[in-house]
Design a protein with these regions (language model features):
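Short beta-strand
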Residues: 51, 468-470, 762-767
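Extended two-metal-dependent nuclease catalytic cores across DNA- and RNA-processing enzymes
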Residues: 2-175
Length: 815
């Protein structure tokens, strides 16, 4: 089966189930066998049977009461050819059962039926018309003409019998099936409707008579404004012991002491909240004239302050309006779902409903379209009620199942000790933000603009004309037609001017070097100089959003703006860090793990040479260069060290010889030799990486030191490129994922220490393996001590984790 089709089989089953169609399957039997069994059983019960299929093998099942209906595509459309037993005889001159013998003699490569060599359809049909069966034809070998057919059947009679067995459809398969199963109701069910919407089957949707299907839970969704009713609901919820809730943020702020920390912090007000604590108790509580937003928050705070478990779709979002103490009573359904399947882009409530509660329910877009919930509350009150209630009902409904799955997959501890505490850490980091000097940012942009203008002029002079440098079509024309440079790859839209093409040219053509530099500076200006300015808020700080449920490896990412991609290679790119300043009177303290992934590789592989090198604080890259290039340690050149560094880090990422050759601008053969020498020097690493691949093939996923799983569907793909990609991920994911776990542990520990020790200093940013703290001047030494203890103590490895710590009056100096 083609990989593309195999991937769709679960969706087909899901759709048929949603439409109320019974699925019959039996391990060890083909679909033809199940069709044959059901057809013959039904015929025996006096039923008229029709089988619709494009497979002519099924003609052997035709009888006076079993009709085989074969669709045939013609210019005028699809026509159906109907075959009862008499129609098979008329068309093929053999009976349905004899059709098996014809198929066995002629063979069929599509069904892996070998047949008899040298006998085609015409000869096979003639033999069976004359003798009735393969066995009878063999009994009359001397009569068979031509002689070649006689000889072939004689020599390959065993193969003919085996082929007949293969071609025969089993009509006594051991399946559980009854006529009741075959009854069809309304195919166009609510569940099927929702699935068609999810899969965007627009033509199918037009066949449904419903606009918005109802789920049974929706019957209990209610809108409550009465003060006494709201009070009664909270009393009842307290007795339930577990609630799902969703706060609806409004406009404005409240400045009460809502936080556990000493300083009062401004919090968003809410328009209301939804709450669910049974299949019948699901409602939206509206703040208004009878009950204020503050009173609702106080009720939910009091409720959660006891022993009541609180489940939400997005705990970090909830903390923006309702600061909650850090403990395991609070449950984040999206984070749990992410751990169980980190390959998805997002984790909306309708997906959790389907995956962990077996419910097909409308999505936010289905209900609200592009309207915000606050606006939809007025414009689409019924749709709003469904949305806001589902946001409470689904986390309540799925909590137990999600926790069960976390436990079954060995990730309960990962959730409890790393991911859940991280929600609180990230929430505080987002609230703190980081100060950006708007004037310095403006000056940085002006400096970039000036350099870009100089480059533009030089590029135009080199090209002999002005043109749009940002247009691939115009640039391709200049480089490959006017200037006749090599490596031109023509596509449908013109020549490729991708970075890999230009980098080859840049070695010999200064003009191309300037174009690459122009692109880098233009990117810096648009993304950082211009882009960051749009995110500076009234407090003068940027409050990025850390994304905890996005990357498959467990790494954090950030948006609005993305601070994970702050440049580090170009000096002019690094200069952007100068615009990030601590608040007045404070100092930045920056700590960065040193070679964390290589240290993890040393630990997980158990390679004694690498472990010993780290314990002796050797220069790892110089040592690798010495091994790979067979050069005494003290004679290793800077170039050899740089190449060895690329090999070291490339191995961690499962790099291929092609990838390494591209990185080092060497031949693929040379790169392969580097890799082979590396593994000769560090045999335990080769053994470890091969073991990672084999284990992933067996399990279908990779796993980190802390139990994080990364599913690897690619590793079993029939496509070589996909499978190779899966194997590289299998090597890298345990290492990169473990590094992600360690930095998260460090973040949680540093964050908690700063708070528990009553310090004014705060953790602001995490970028890859780096933490940035805004430290009070009298706390700098203590902050350094905390970073050293907590980052090094985040994992117990056979090689000590090391950090580089720096201070400065801006992020550039601290780095």
């Amino acid at each position: 089966m083609a990989e593309e089709l195999r991937q769709q089989v679960p969706l087909m089953k899901e759709m048929l189930t949603a439409m109320g169609v019974t699925i019959v399957e039996k391990e060890g039997y083909e679909a033809d066998d199940l069709l044959g069994t059901i057809a013959k059983q039904s015929e025996a019960q006096g039923l008229e049977v029709s089988i619709v299929s494009g497979d002519r093998d099924l003609l052997q099942l035709a009888s006076d009461h079993i009709k085989i209906r074969i669709p045939k595509t013609k210019r005028t459309g699809t026509e159906i050819e109907d075959y009862l037993a008499k129609d098979v005889v008329e068309k093929y001159q053999v009976t349905p059962l004899q059709f098996i013998d014809v198929k066995a003699l002629m063979g069929d490569s599509a069904d892996n039926i070998p047949g008899v060599p040298g006998i085609g359809e015409k000869t096979a049909t003639a033999l069976i018309v004359s003798y009735g069966s393969i066995e009878n034809a063999h009994d009359h070998l001397e009569e068979i003409k031509p002689n070649r057919a006689k000889q072939n059947l004689s020599e390959h009679y065993d193969m003919a019998q085996m082929s007949k067995e293969l071609a025969t459809i089993e009509i006594h398969a051991p399946i559980e099936y009854s006529l009741e199963d075959a009854k069809l109701g309304n195919l166009f069910t609510e569940e099927a409707y929702l699935m068609c919407k999810r899969l965007e089957f627009k033509n199918m949707l037009s066949r449904f008579d419903i606009d918005a299907p109802k789920n049974l839970a929706e019957e209990h969704f209610t809108f409550v404004t009465d003060k006494k009713q709201i009070s009664d609901i909270f009393k009842k919820a307290k007795k339930a012991g577990h609630i799902g809730c969703c706060l609806l943020p409004g406009e404005g702020i409240i400045t009460e002491q809502l936080s556990l920390f000493e300083q009062p912090k401004e919090q968003q007000v809410i328009e209301g909240m939804s709450i669910a604590f049974s299949e019948e108790d699901i409602c939206y509580l509206s703040a208004g004239t009878e009950v204020s937003a503050e009173e609702l928050l106080e009720e939910i705070r009091e409720l959660s302050g006891g022993q009541t478990k609180v489940s939400v779709m997005d705990l970090k979002e909830t903390l923006k309006t309702l600061p909650l103490p850090e403990n395991d009573r609070y449950f984040d359904a999206s984070v749990a779902a992410y751990l169980l399947n980190p390959l998805k882009n997002d984790y909306p409530y309708e997906d959790l409903a389907k995956d962990y509660a077996g419910l097909m329910i409308p999505s936010k877009t289905d209900l609200l379209g592009k309207e915000s919930p606050v606006k939809a509350k007025q414009a689409k009150p019924e749709a709003f009620l469904k949305y806001i209630c589902y946001m409470a009902y689904i986390p309540w409904k799925t909590r137990d199942r999600l926790l069960e799955e976390l436990n079954n997959t060995g990730m309960q501890t990962l959730y409890d000790t790393i991911e859940l505490p991280l929600v609180y850490t990230l929430s505080d980091m987002e609230k703190e933000g980081v100060h950006v000097d708007a004037e310095e940012l403006k000056r940085y942009g002006e400096e970039l603009a000036a350099q870009i203008a100089v480059l533009e002029k030089e590029i135009y002079e080199g090209a002999g004309e002005t043109f749009n440098i940002n247009s691939p079509k115009q640039l391709g024309h200049i480089l490959f037609e006017k200037l006749e440079m090599p490596y031109g790859k023509k596509t449908k839209t013109g020549y490729s001017t991708a970075a890999d093409v230009l980098e080859k040219l840049a070695v010999e053509y200064p003009l191309v070097s300037k174009i690459l530099e122009y692109r880098q500076l233009a990117k810096l200006k648009s993304t950082y100089a211009d882009g960051l300015a749009n995110f500076i808020e009234e407090d003068g700080r940027i409050h990025t959003t850390f994304q905890q449920t996005v990357t498959a490896t467990g790494r954090l990412s950030s948006t609005d703006p993305n601070l994970q991609n702050i440049p580090i290679r170009m000096e002019l790119g690094r200069m952007i860090r100068k615009v990030f300043l601590p608040k007045d009177g404070y100092i930045f303290v920056d700590a960065d793990y040193s070679q964390i992934e290589l240290r993890i590789l040393a630990h997980m592989s158990g390679d004694e040479m690498l472990i010993q090198a780290y314990r002796e604080a050797q220069d790892i890259h110089r040592m690798t260069a010495s091994q790979v290039f067979h050069t005494p340690f003290e004679e290793v050149t800077d170039l050899q060290r740089r190449n060895a560094k690329a090999v070291n880090f490339g191995i961690v990422y499962g790099i291929s010889s092609f990838g390494l050759s591209q990185d080092l601008s060497i031949s693929k053969k040379e790169a392969q030799e580097y890799i082979e020498r590396y593994f000769e020097s560090y045999p335990k690493i080769k053994e470890f990486l091969d073991g990672c691949v084999e284990k992933a093939k067996k399990d279908g996923y990779s796993v980190t030191m802390f139990g994080r799983r990364r599913p690897l569907p690619e590793i079993s793909s029939s496509n070589f490129m996909q499978r190779s990609f899966g194997e590289r991920i299998a090597m890298n994911a345990p290492i990169q994922g473990t590094a992600a776990d360690i930095i998260k542990i460090a973040m949680n520990r540093v964050h908690r220490r700063l708070i528990d020790e009553g310090l004014k200093s705060r953790l602001l940013l995490q970028v890859h393996d780096e933490l940035l703290i805004e430290a009070a001047p009298d706390e700098v030494d203590e902050v350094k001590k905390i970073l050293d203890e907590e980052m090094k103590g985040a994992a117990d490895l056979s090689v000590e984790l090391e950090i580089d710590t720096h201070t400065g009056k801006n992020w550039y100096e601290a780095k």
